Amino acid sequence: MSRQFTLGLVTLAGTAVFGLVGPAAADGIAMSHRYASLGDVSAVYHQPTRPLFGMETKATTGDVSSKWQAVEAEIEQEKIILTHCRIEQACPAAARELLDIVAEGADRVGRARVGWINRAVNLALIPTSDEAQWGVADRWSPPFETLQTHRGDCEDYAIVKYVALLEAGLSRDDLKIVILRDFVHNEDHAVLAARVDGEWLILNNNSLTLVRDSDMVGAKPMFVLDQDGAHRLRAIARV
């Protein structure tokens, strides 16, 4: 998943659609009260909604599942560090940077907060393939590692946003990393889906614009990764 491309907002016959529009471009730091918990920004809007992309899911195993399990384990360890950072006077630099991103969105709510964190993460990192950075075809990094190098590819962006939005108060039920198939470049791409006000929004690593899952064209959703593991997406069978 090395190619960097934008899933951007396009207008066709007056209708907004989601399309592929090309590439965009010190430990021991004292902490402050602004890192206090921001509360759940999505729970108040919890209501029955259509499934993500209007598709059903089926649990899956294999490479995607194994990589997600490994990253999830590291995320849980890093969340413990983030919890300590909120109450102690010192914190690793990468943890501080992640909490800075979260804190900068503290005066925003709902979609505005999600959009701010999407923007902040996109601007904090430099798109870099795993081959260029690590010398391997595909590597999924936990948030602190990505923020230490300030480089990563699509799934690294999505993972940082996933944890940042958890720290910002979104429920785990409202966050899913999505692996897509890009038909334009014939390769895979990862984004984050966040549910706000009962609506699924797509956060892309090269777009500052949030768009609805129902407006996406040019790519096929294949897998979702969340608190329940890895699942394959498939069309809902009609009866």
Regions picked out by a protein language model, each given a short descriptive name:
Residues 2-8, 19-239:
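A structural boundary/capping signal
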Residues 11-14:
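Hydrophobic helical h-region of N-terminal Sec-dependent signal peptides
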